[in-house]
């Protein structure tokens, strides 16, 4: 079994995913064969791994940081929330059904075998495996049968480092409190802690570090400052989107309704990185900005439920007004399905609503079907005759007259649809804006001169900057010596 270290958080969104990605790049830069692993993830931001299954986008980014192909075994259990009570269960890249509350708690012990099998596969040939926990080990009500945090750490005998987020406040209490409520067996797995997202003079927290060590007996591995490189990396959780605020007005405003079950929102990251573009995330209860030149309907885990939510917010009427003003609309995956005349779900795959009228902006209809399409693709944009690389993760088959004007060509078949005037577009492809030449042509058609940024290179550069920041702020030698 490969050497391993596990990073668990005092809560969700403390920065574990990006931290592990940065440490993966640190280890790679030191000449180590390093791999990422996350036993269980809950996210609608999924990727298609290089071996053809679904994993969390965070593990895809971590694999990139390691310089290795991504694998379903890097995230063997993925939960994709689709209702308030249930999630789609993905095991080793494949759909295994729906997981609901107490039923999933009863199922977790059975999933440990798959988790350990994947952990062994990831570690095969590696010098080091960096493991990311989920949520917090302090949720002791979920400890029985746990596979995400201490249940995995104790089963696999992997030492744990706790991560606290000082930016949200209360980091001393969160770390000391976690120490207090952990069972002795779990507490013994913790080798130390680190502080993330510090702003200002780090020396001002010296007494805080000493206090945490005094209360817990855990050593400090350092304090990570607020690193600008993080903002240039894909975010895993939609909670990050909720913090977005409008800045100085740019040449193109792109409005994105924040659907309740928004998925794969990192499709928007290349647009956010363009100097002349401002991406405005529109929360429920707010109106689409009247000065938007483009509205993007993003992917969603539950198309029908989010279409209903879109209507409840009045965004359907605002979309029609946007189009009448001469605005453009792009629907991606579930957003593409919403643009049509009708969505039918006779088998109730998404829920109790079996048939619903769409937005009617494209002359298409979608029939939900059980078979799920999960694949990486190479395509050609038929709008600009430029190459595209992306991926598909969807259920449903779409047809109709506007499909005669496809968005892209994938191998021997067409994808998507475009309205007769070219202002309404839809595609099943995620990741299209990562293709630099396509993105530049797309923006130019909207009257904006795109920059000459190479998006993939910018992500690599951000990972390198993140690694440099971690090398400078953490006791890396001490951390890696834990494994």
Swiss-Prot record:
Residue numbers annotated as active site: 333 (nucleophile), 430
One GO process term, biological-process aspect: cobalamin biosynthetic process
Coiled coil regions, renumbered to chain: none
Pathway it works in: Cofactor biosynthesis; adenosylcobalamin biosynthesis
Keyword tRNA processing in record: no
Every GATase cobBQ-type domain range: 251-438
Tagged with keyword Lipid metabolism: no
Pfam families: CbiA, GATase_3
Protein family membership: Belongs to the CobB/CobQ family. CobQ subfamily.
Reported function: Catalyzes amidations at positions B, D, E, and G on adenosylcobyrinic A,C-diamide. NH(2) groups are provided by glutamine, and one molecule of ATP is hydrogenolyzed for each amidation.
Protein's name according to its UniProt entry: Cobyric acid synthase
Source organism of the structure: Brucella suis biovar 1 (strain 1330)
